[in-house]
Amino acid sequence: MSIQYTTVGDLKVGNYVVIDGEPCRVVEISKAKTGKHGSAKANIVAIGLFTGQKRTLMAPVDQQVEVPIIEKHIGQILADKGDTITIMDMENYETFDIEKPTDADIVDKIRPGAEVEYWEIMGRKKIVRVK
């Protein structure tokens, strides 16, 4: 798995974090200083990149969290198989199947021969946009 570590206090809106084994994009952060002897806590709300599910993380700001390393690639659509799409990577010409995205803007532009940008995150692949 391609991950690195950072502290909860260093996270900002728009960053990526792993919550419950799922890579997520941070959409909201609120920090609260507790009492005289307590350390500050952060409440992080994030949306899963693959599931779209809302996830929350409540942790001290000095706690280490996993941050996924996102590898961005360009590929060409070879075939639309209904639920999956066959893509060929433009750098190493490897072919593989990716689950069809649910975003209507992307689905409308999918056609054989079109170039797509896809992300590889923690061993999983996702189409982000069609060029």
UniProtKB/Swiss-Prot annotation:
It comes from the Archaea. It is found in: Cytoplasm. This is Translation initiation factor 5A. One of its GO terms (biological process) is positive regulation of translational termination. The keyword Cytoplasm applies. SMART domains: eIF-5a. Functions by promoting the formation of the first peptide bond.
